[in-house]
Amino acid sequence: MTTIGPIENEIKELLTKELNPINLEIINESYMHNVPKGSESHFKVKIVSEKFETLSMIEQHRLVNEILKNFIGNGKIHALSITSRTPTQWKKNNQTKINVDDDKSPSCKGGFGK
C-alpha cells in the first residue's frame, strides 16, 4: 500500500471542497520519472463531478487547473494529467471507477542522464 503524501492529500482536499466529486482518484505517478523516491511531482487526477455537466472537456480541465493553480504555478507539481467525467457520462459507461487502463501514462522519456 502506498502512503499518501502531503501534496496528494491537499489536492484531494481542494478538489473535494470545490467540486464535491462523486468519484475522485488521485494517482501519484512520480515513481515513473527520474525524481527522488517519495517525490510528489507528477499526478493523474480522475474525477466525476456534477459541476462538469454544462462544461466542455477543456472547460472541465481548466476548472481543475484553476483549483490547483497554486501547486502548478509554484512548481510543486511538474505534471498533471486530468480525466474528467460528468455523472451522466460516468453512469452511461456503467462505471464505479474511471478505468485506469483507459489512459495509461507514458513512461518517462527524459530526465537526468536518460
Curated annotation (Swiss-Prot):
Protein name: BolA-like protein DDB_G0274169
The organism of origin for this protein: Dictyostelium discoideum
Protein family according to the UniProt entry: Belongs to the BolA/IbaG family.
Pfam families: BolA
Annotated Polar residues bias: 88-98
Residue ranges of the region described as Disordered: 88-114
Gene3D superfamilies cross-referenced by the UniProt entry: BolA-like
InterPro entries for the chain: BolA, BolA-like_sf, BolA/IbaG_stress_morph_reg
Transmembrane segments: none
